[in-house]
Amino acid sequence: MDKKYLISTNYEIDSLSNFEKKVASHLSDSSKIFNYDELIKNTKFFKKKNTLKSKKHCKRLTNKIFNQLYFHITQDTKSVISKKAYSIILIPFLNIFIETIYEKFIQYNKVVLRNKKLTLMLLNKKNFIYFKNFAEFISLSQNDLFNLQLVSEIIYFNKYSNNKKIIENRKLKTFFKKTKNYFFERFNQISKTNYSYINKKKDLNSSIAMFKIDFRHDIFLKEFLKYKVPLKKNLNKKFFEKFNLIEVKQDNDLREKILYKLKSNLKIENFIFKMAIKYLPSLYFESISMNLENIENNIVNVPKFLISNAHGWWTDDKFKFYAAICIKNKTKYFDVQHNGTYFMIDKNPHFMISKYFRDYFIGWGSACEQDKYSIKLPVLYNVNNQSTKIKNNFTNKNHKIIFMGASIKRYFGGYFQSYLTGGNSFLYYHSQYQFINNLSKNIRKNLILRLRHNNRDPRGYIDYLKRNFKGLKYEDIKISAASRLTDNNVKIIVVDHCSTPWLEALQANKPIILFWSKSENSINKKYLPLINILKKYKIYFECPIAAANRLEEISKKNIKWWYKDKNIQKLRKKILDLFFYNNSKPVKLWNEKIKKIYYGKF
């Protein structure tokens, strides 16, 4: 009898015969080639269930592991570092790693327990690869070989009774290591040492330091730095060149000791504990003390305020160690919003994680003010309101339709709140394809796609689009959305996901169509009435076919209808005030608000 294999990545497929490939069972769409006709025959998409429950469970596990690691750092090495300071180094990595392997465990275990006849494919442990830091993990999390490795960890841990096939490919491992070494920074590695950290208190200087608030904010930074009271400085790449991070080899005895203390009655928790301790880069544990002192030896003092956002530093280890020193010495850290999912999506991950170490949060609109020490300041994206310009200058040349798509990860990459996190992206592709498929040829010829898909993606979605819709135009996304949406020839904007583009489109004030699945995005219940109003005014749709029909309808209208509809304009202003607040003097407002906090008047 032929074996039926469970496939989790593209990597396993090459080792199967044509018949085995045909009958194989796929863990998710990550190992499949996109085909719309096949999808509509089988509409059983992977649905997100209890995502916030899983999120809360992962947070509890994050806290439990973090507390154990912090205890040993302060007790065994006598490091003088606060929990708040250590959290900016460790929590961003730890939380995402836990959510990623948690999701993988739940998904794989569920499939295997349903069918004991499946033959499981796994890597030989000798072929396992390991990451040195958070940046490497983010890259590996979307790699076939590493995802097969995580699946293999689950198989080894659970000891399933299913038949198994072990895959070996040392050549690929060697090639991958060389590739990894080429792209990622190497650290100086030293053996385990009985190192004693000597705390060196740093004085606060009078400055406000800013680091990579966002590459779209360059104009703002230039103007903001002109305000000399309070004094401001921009931390550039050169500032961090003097910091050389050291990697101490793992202390396996200490890690075993910590793992013993993390025992649980739940199998999934024991798996998470084991993986977190096993894969934790020594940079974030054994190497902490030496690197803290290394940073301290290279700075004279620390700023009074430090302002940045996750877009700028999330995987930047040098910044995180520097920020930890600053926080340890009483610097106030300001976290800045960097995308449009904050607050609209329930419990935005970046917002929740930064609670561990931030003092203040700067948000794009009044929605942020629900949280203590959150400040509403103008968004710094340069998208201009086009209403007056278009109403006075509309011609028949304004006929282009911009479609703004999302980047959907192939594998789940942490964060349960939205399909934007990846893992089963065919749901998203299916919806997008349905929309395009239900447009007339006349509309399609005016449609311009701004998609962030990788052309080398093995799922073949872009190639599928190009084969089936030969007249479609694709735009270089290097041109900023801010510039593109304000072009005279753009008449209508379509957005199929709930991140920043829908807010940019509303600010541009051109007719807009939104469609995304409410069931696949954990929308904050507080704003569900807002979604219903958008539905009422035929702006928001859950069904892509209904959205396509609406586009056909409004494309025939003179654009002035959008501006004459007082209800739409009123709703638009309300949404922008909540999530995308704009002001004619943003730099001045930023300086005034931060100045008040600086002088204790907030």
Task: Give residue spans per PLM region.
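Catalytic-core helical/loop segments in enzymes performing group transfer/polymerization on anionic/lipid-linked
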Residues: 1-602
